[in-house]
Amino acid sequence: MMPFPVTTQGPPQPAPPPNRYGVSSPISLAVPKETDCLLTQRLIETLRPFGVFEEEEELQRRILVLEKLNNLVKEWIREISESKSLPQSVIENVGGKIFTFGSYRLGVHTKGADIDALCVAPSHVDRSDFFTSFYAKLKLQEEVKDLRAVEEAFVPVIKLCFDGIEIDILFARLALQTIPEDLDLRDDSLLKNLDIRCIRSLNGCRVTDEILHLVPNIDNFRLTLRAIKLWAKCHNIYSNILGFLGGVSWAMLVARTCQLYPNAVASTLVRKFFLVFSEWEWPNPVLLKEPEERNLNLPVWDPRVNPSDRYHLMPIITPAYPQQNSTYNVSISTRMVMIEEFKQGLAITHEILLSKAEWSKLFEAPSFFQKYKHYIVLLASASTEKQHLEWVGLVESKIRILVGSLEKNEFITLAHVNPQSFPAPKENPDMEEFRTMWVIGLGLKKPDNSEILSIDLTYDIQSFTDTVYRQAVNSKMFEMGMKITAMHLRRKELHQLLPHHVLQDKKAHSTEGRRLTDLNDSSFDLSAGCENSMSVPSSTSTMKTGPLISSSQGRNSPALAVMTASVANIQATEFSLQQVNTNESSGVALNESIPHAVSQPAISPSPKAMVARVVSSTCLISHPDLQETQQQTYLIL
């Protein structure tokens, strides 16, 4: 197996028609028509300005860097073998190899993207060797910059910049004396007698390779995935850590679409993607292949056996053993947001099919800051850049807990977090302080039998800050100066914290510079409008708070996810308002319908009532490390 992807785009070739792809029969085996190929070419031209295609020169540079890294690994393993007095016959054939996974291995990486890599070594090479002698060897290379090891991570990794290309290297030691060049990591027998960290490290490569193995046409899959990933980023639903979907989950959804329409080209597959998943009957899982039991006693996703798996709202199951749900972070709110986006994507691609819109419309950014009347702004700050980097990572990883807590409030219909983070204006221009903000849009409802409604968010916010500070202290990461602040702002007050170009209704949207980390206008007045904002400083270990329920557990009783993939009602539903002529578009089976876009959004709109005021009472908190105040906050409708 080659570690480097082939990214050349050749003419699409129809796949040979087997009885079924994946876990069900295809919906349609129709081959593309001239209009479909023309729409695909227009899609490619629309994608180019977004930087989703890498130039050949840059691709060759990546290949050269990986070859150098691969040679370093082989050289290092030979040195380790000699130091451990292995026979010369073994040393000469000991091998060792760098494998790639993620977007680069899938062949859908963008300009300037990093590379996920895996160093595979034989049994006599220890993980400690990887983080000592191999780390030292990398440090001697002139091309290597920003070298750092994260040995205690859930998946231990060495991070570096090699000749200007960011690379994350994982490590796995196999129960083999030598590592052959033609090693296939999809072989389940390789998992025998491995520790859990090696299994986790292997998982990325195994899943990526399995996905490529299970799609009917790799070129069509890649182009479709490029389009869907760009769409997801433009629409702010690309973030596994915040409860949306990450790269591997989007890849599996696209792969399932390719299985259902094995001969379709990218323009058709993009449209079918929205059709399939706007109608998917969640929590039925998305599966690319039937789960297999290997009797290796590894935990696998199975709601029949594991009660916690029954609470997963949008399960997308990895195809490699041990099968896992890649979307366990999805909450009620994030699923609602994504389903609405699927439906809107279906409506737009339907317009494109009828020549009523261009592909560029699909990649227009939604108006997040115009969508809701009420917002919660989370602000994380630290005294130094290094502290800020660690602090922001921890806070961001816990935001989904706050979303899950807010969802349980009977008067909150939706807690929509924007995955983009924004630099916050400085509170004191004379002090060096590093600040980052996240914004959560709130959908609220007002009972009919009440004219005034008080929504107390104190417990939700305080529980969230408790969780963050507790983990920071327990992991010995906490430093004085690390703070979390939460503020409630109405839509018309967002300009106090966010620059105009972020708030304006932008149509054209580029993925370059999306995190906006270069913005920090110190002229913004953080204290403006403080009457209508709430500040919730750090919590302490002395505060007695109940445990938060995971964001994957909703307000309602969980529905048991069955171990079968459904094609929803795609084949059963009939045309309702508008009907597509099957002679005008290939890949549309005669018994298949494209549902008309709903006229009302899937997410409940914000209520008419505005927040009138915020009532606060303050009490002191005593803590050996911190002296802070706690505010109780109510939204008065």
From Swiss-Prot:
Protein's UniProt keywords contain Nucleotide-binding: yes
Compartment(s) of residence: Nucleus
Cofactor requirements of the protein: Mg(2+); Mn(2+)
KW Repeat (keyword) present: no
Catalytic activity line of the entry: RNA(n) + ATP = RNA(n)-3'-adenine ribonucleotide + diphosphate
Class in the EC hierarchy, top level: transferase
SUPFAM superfamilies: Nucleotidyltransferase, PAP/Archaeal CCA-adding enzyme, C-terminal domain, PAP/OAS1 substrate-binding domain
Name of the protein in its database record: Poly(A) polymerase beta
Organism: Homo sapiens (Human)
